[in-house]
Amino acid sequence: MKLVFRWFGEKHDTVTLEQIRQIPGVEGVVGALFDIPVGEVWPLEEIMKLKETVERAGLKLEVIESVNVHEDIKLGLPTRDRYIENYKETIRNLAKAGVKVVCYNFMPVFDWMRTDLHKKLPDGSETMEYDHSLIEGVTPDELIERVKEGSEGFVLPGWEWDRLEKLRETFELYKNVDEEKLFENLVYFLERVIPVCEECDVKLAIHPDDPPWSIFGLPRIITNKENIERLLKAVDSPYNGITLCMGSLGANPENNIPEMIRYFGKMGRIHFAHVRNLKFTGEKSFYETAHPSFCGSHDLFEVMKAFHDIGYEGYIRPDHGRLIWGEKARPGYGLYDRALGATYILGLWEAISKMKERYC
């Protein structure tokens, strides 16, 4: 296991590289270039600047999250080939900088979705919540305004405002795209990009839909074991893999996360993992909790044991954390709770390793 920590860059993050460097066991950061418009080539010069900044702090930059996929590719529009060529060139540039894994998603219009970015918990901490009944009661425009207000000026990953400017127009285009068509468009994209990944030794890791069900009638296609397996078989290359995000897949209690880790891990197709916990509050409703098992609805010991059992040597990062101890930061991405999550993950890994050494 290689423990990494998401970082949004000097311009966009309240957390510094110096602080990340002091978290025990963290080897590197998961970075991105947030000022490059979606669909444009990431210049090698800018990638190298990011790499040099990270390495000066004593950390590595081997995982990128995310190189966003242009909406024209998801929609299957005639312009998609131009954007696919740009994506391929970005992968080549990332490879030159030593990047090993690129996380991406194929969610239409919206990235991850929450209805409250500042839910107050009894202990005074703040967390993010998803209440499906609120989704059913608002328009997409109203929800965007709510997210803007709750972001407190931070640009949230996947919610870059330039992507949402043509919301109504984009929704209209998706009226002709069902789950099957979206899947076809994803396969079309991968059939052209994966050969470049193979040439450059860069692995693609698709992030599951968050949450793993349809919202506002938009199709969702990476939601469970069955449709993930279908995608991996459709483009059957070890470079076509997944980001095992237990918070996204785990929002559906029918998804058995340890089982999925063992299944896809034995196939060698888990290239990256996000580990976090959440608490179910009703059907299709939950809020995010601290990482320890007793705080949420998932057993983190069993999750980490599954990774250990398959001999996982890939990248893992603590995912969304609460805002605690008065911290003002991007919702889900403060320093303190994610640092606690990182040490909890590391502690579980050490305990599992030593249990096996002594008793197996």
UniProtKB/Swiss-Prot annotation:
GO terms for molecular function: ferrous iron binding; manganese ion binding; mannonate dehydratase activity. The keyword Hydrolase does not apply. One of its GO terms (biological process) is D-glucuronate catabolic process. It catalyses: D-mannonate = 2-dehydro-3-deoxy-D-gluconate + H2O. Disulfide bonds: none annotated. It comes from the Bacteria. InterPro entries: Man_deHydtase, Xyl_isomerase-like_sf. Its cofactor is Fe(2+); Mn(2+). Pathway: Carbohydrate metabolism; pentose and glucuronate interconversion. It is an enzyme of class 4 (lyase). SUPFAM superfamilies: Xylose isomerase-like. Keywords: Iron, Lyase, Manganese. The keyword ATP-binding does not apply. Its EC number is 4.2.1.8. It holds the Pfam family UxuA. Belongs to the mannonate dehydratase family. Catalyzes the dehydration of D-mannonate. HAMAP family: UxuA. This is Mannonate dehydratase. It comes from Thermotoga neapolitana (strain ATCC 49049 / DSM 4359 / NBRC 107923 / NS-E).
